[in-house]
UniProtKB/Swiss-Prot annotation:
Assembly description: In the presence of PdxT, forms a dodecamer of heterodimers.
Name the record gives this protein: Pyridoxal 5'-phosphate synthase subunit PdxS
Keyword Iron-sulfur included in the entry's annotation: no
Alphabetical list of Pfam families matching this protein: SOR_SNZ
Alphabetical UniProt keywords: Lyase, Pyridoxal phosphate, Schiff base
Gene name, Swiss-Prot/TrEMBL: pdxS
Native source organism of the sequence: Methanococcus vannielii
Swiss-Prot/TrEMBL GO biological process terms: amino acid metabolic process; pyridoxal phosphate biosynthetic process; pyridoxine biosynthetic process
Family (UniProt): Belongs to the PdxS/SNZ family.
Residues annotated as binding D-glyceraldehyde 3-phosphate: R103
Length: 237
């Protein structure tokens, strides 16, 4: 409901991000027209297109997209995404999928950098064409930067200050936290603690201190207990 977005924009001074279904470019057009600061092409919503994502280069509003591995990340960047995030498994309070996705992206980057530094250009071309399915120019940019060419945030299952610090130490540029805060016993205190842990991710003493007396955490869900067809992170290509 656009009215809800207008109400939120009027109530806060921080940037407002709204979700559009994967491939639903008209939803994205509407969100851009009402002035959201960023659009999340999100697997949390039922996809509108099972084959194609939104051509994000056709918009002026920046997009964030989820990725489980380097191929998904680079394909979204090639489409125009300004930010990447792990897909995680939203609403579970279980960080295991976000960790898995970040490790996969890091391992993919390490392979690209390794091939490039060893002069194995033929392997890079094959990787770009057959595995990652992106133009060679993006691969070379990753090899040069030794990271993604856009910021990469963690999302999905982050519920504690230690979770946030874990993802930052793994190389994330920041974190998204939703239900891990709002479904906890004391959202305001937990939110502040997660912010502190994100800023001070390499200071375990401080993380331990801000983790005290946060109230009841969101109840975590074991990923193995979720039926295969209900997993959100598998949506998108």
């Amino acid at each position: 409901d656009p009215d809800m977005i207008f109400e939120i924009k009027d109530a806060v001074s921080i940037p407002v991000m709204a979700k559009a279904r994967i491939g639903h470019f008209v939803e994205a057009q509407v969100l851009e027209s009402i002035g959201v600061d960023m659009i999340d092409e999100s697997e949390v919503l039922t996809p509108a297109d099972e084959i194609n994502h939104i051509n994000k280069k056709a918009f002026t509003a920046p997009f964030v997209c989820g990725a489980r591995n380097l191929g998904e990340a680079l394909r979204r960047i090639d489409e125009g995404a300004a930010m990447i995030r792990t897909k995680g498994e939203a609403g579970t309070g279980n960080v295991v999928e976000a960790v898995k996705h970040m490790r996969a992206v890091n391992e993919g980057i390490a392979r690209v950098v390794g091939y490039h530094e060893m002069g194995l250009e033929a392997e890079l071309v094959q990787m770009a064409r057959n595995e990652l399915k992106v133009p060679m120019e993006i691969i070379l940019e990753v090899a040069k930067l030794k990271r993604l060419p856009v910021v990469n945030f963690a999302a999905g299952g982050i519920a504690t200050p230690a979770d946030a610090a874990l993802m930052m130490q793994m190389g994330c540029d920041g974190v998204f936290v939703g239900s891990g805060i709002f479904k906890s016993g004391n959202p305001e205190i937990r939110a502040k603690a997660i912010v502190e842990a994100t800023y001070n991710f390499d200071k375990p003493e401080l993380i331990g201190e801000v983790s005290k007396n946060l109230g009841e955490a969101m109840v975590g869900i074991n990923i193995d207990q979720i039926p295969e067809e209900m997993l959100l992170a598998k949506r998108g290509i």
